[in-house]
């Protein structure tokens, strides 16, 4: 009986502590956490698949985003862009097939990665992607930032070949 009472008291203490920790997430803490995540070197987007034998005429885009130190839902919106010879810059491909929204779940710690593979026809040309990283809490956006794909992220999961990371992809 005494053991059951001690267990109940400990469980109640843990519940109260968890509730007060959640209550400590005020606007100032949220702003600091979002600013830190936005400036983090762990926040990136990369091309991890580019027209390989296994992924013929495919573009793979992967992103990584840090958590905020408290529970927040995390999303990435991936928009594939093409090189415009006329405008000498990358422009968004105007098709629902070139945009996807990825949910990375609700997390409080660590780094989260996800990605998407986009099929194209041969001779599409030079592509990259713009990724919008979004943190929400209670259904409201608390942070959002944008990155273009860059090279050098050899820890990108599911790369083909392994450790492949590039800023752009040419579909030939």
Please name every model-derived segment.
Residues 90-107:
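Solvent-exposed serine/threonine-rich low-complexity stretches and specific carbohydrate-binding patches
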Residues 137-172:
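Short beta-strand elements
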Residues 6-17:
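Bacterial N-terminal signal peptides
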């Amino acid at each position: 009986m005494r053991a059951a009472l001690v267990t109940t008291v400990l469980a109640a203490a843990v519940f109260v502590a968890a509730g007060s920790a959640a209550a400590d997430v005020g606007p100032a803490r949220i702003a600091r956490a979002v600013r830190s995540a936005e400036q983090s070197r762990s926040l990136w987007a990369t091309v991890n698949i580019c027209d390989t034998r296994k992924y013929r005429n495919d573009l793979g885009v992967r992103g990584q985003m840090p958590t905020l130190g408290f529970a927040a839902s995390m999303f990435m919106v991936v928009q594939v862009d093409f090189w415009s010879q006329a405008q000498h810059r990358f422009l968004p491909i105007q098709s629902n097939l070139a945009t996807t929204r990825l949910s990375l779940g609700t997390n409080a710690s660590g780094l989260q990665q996800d990605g998407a593979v986009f099929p194209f026809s041969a001779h599409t040309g030079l592509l990259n992607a713009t990724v919008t990283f979004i943190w929400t809490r209670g259904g409201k956006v608390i942070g959002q930032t944008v990155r273009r794909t860059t090279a050098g992220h050899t820890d990108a999961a599911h790369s083909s070949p392994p450790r492949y990371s590039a800023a752009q992809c040419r579909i030939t």
